[in-house]
Amino acid sequence: MDLLYGGWEAMQTKAFFLQALTPVHPGTGQVSGSVIDLPVAREAATGFPLIPASSLKGVLRDGRTDEAANKVFGSPEQMGELTLTDARLLLLPVRSYAGTFALITCPLVLQRWRRDAEALGLSLELPQPSITGEEVLAGSAIQYNHQVILEDIDLRVKGSSEALAKAISGLLFGKEEQGLMERLALVSNDVFSYFCQTGLEVIARVRLESASKTVASGALWYEEAVPAEAVFSCFAIAKDAAHFAELHRRPYLQIGGEASVGRGLLRVLGGV
């Protein structure tokens, strides 16, 4: 889709998505003053986890320094021709009494995604249902006695999430994906914010003394990670649509810290 960008030049835009296959630690590069020593990056206003565009662009470039890579991603002397936004959280997995886990989103996330897509010239159909308080629109697998029980929160089923699940599934997979169709839950903005603060993984890490195999002094720390199955959304902007091929050059990416212990494996989806 064309839009006017910068110096009135016609630009192309694409929406694409990242699905976490293992927990992801998009760190801030700073030690926190809270109990969690190494938190994930978050939006300042909402507190929702995100993957910074700089991290994503660096992984896509993957250390390449050839002229073609410099043209697309930039160099110290020139700006790259491919622009990426931060990858924002679209779906968050939360433990569910029925169906093992739910994939939750909220009206605020959907409204912001649609607003950004329209601003970038993308005309994509995405339902905008409303939900408040302790209500939920839910897939069949996560319902129990007309309720959805997420961790310690009981929500009353207002209706089905099928229409929304079909739309999101189409964006991500190009078809109806059964797991998403059965597990999608639209919760209120407040409930989504609550789980963004409390529903992430907190992992204790230690460093052992090689001789005694005991924890070294001061070598216990806690780090935060976005759980596996989470889905992030991102927009790409370029004058030449051929640059979008870089988004799918590899079907899987490793993003964030702790790669040596399996963190940060994501699958690239979409491209609409």
Predicted stretch roles:
Residues M1-V272:
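Basic, Gly/Ser/Thr-rich N-terminal segments that form RNA-phosphate-binding interfaces in CRISPR RAMP
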